[in-house]
Amino acid sequence: IHLVTQQRKNKNYSGCIVTNPNCTSAGLTVALKALDDAFGVKKVFAVSLQALSGAGYPGVASLDIMDNVIPNIKGEEEKVEWEPRKMLGKFNNGKIDLADIRFSAHTNRVAVTDGHTVCVSVELTRQTDPQTAEAILRDFSAAESARELPSSPRPVIEVRNEADRPQPRLDRMTGKGMTTVVGRVRRDPILDLKFVVLSHNTIRGAAGGSIYNAELLVSENLL
């Protein structure tokens, strides 16, 4: 919201340009935000398994992806390593100061129609245990200004306790595709915690996220 006001001031116009984050960063950062608020996040190691729909149309050639995993998505790793730091950063003197988080990402294209899965390990500033982290994730809520908007995810984060969840086919439409689903929260022997994040890339990460942004701008009398 502060960036919209600053943009109008800088450009001397009444409109605004609002961009969505990368569809992988969108869901991942929701989970990181909850943990960062509670414990502080110092380091993130993330491996994405990204759906075919994220490649757009006409997408990935069928003979390239059938019976296969493509271990590189051009330009994606750089986005996933940078965008969450911006989203978790602070507005300061007309710009965003990036969050002080060290980030490493691998991005992979997999033969899934919709739903990006990210396997995440984090190092925290303040130690915690998996059960407490699960409770923090489960109780996380949107900013007060966004909680009652029509597209606001309900819940923001759903925590699954099954050993084999979340899965794209089973969980991507949770909260009409706007909820971020987290599972397999456990201790990490190298960092502190590890877990799996699933979000619907074309709903939460694209069209639904755009509508959510527009609703927020209307509610704040910026449109």
Language model regions located:
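C-terminal substrate-binding/catalytic lobe of Rossmann-fold NAD(P)-dependent oxidoreductases
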Residues: 42-192
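Low-complexity, intrinsically disordered segments enriched in Ser/Thr together with acidic residues
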Residues: 194-198
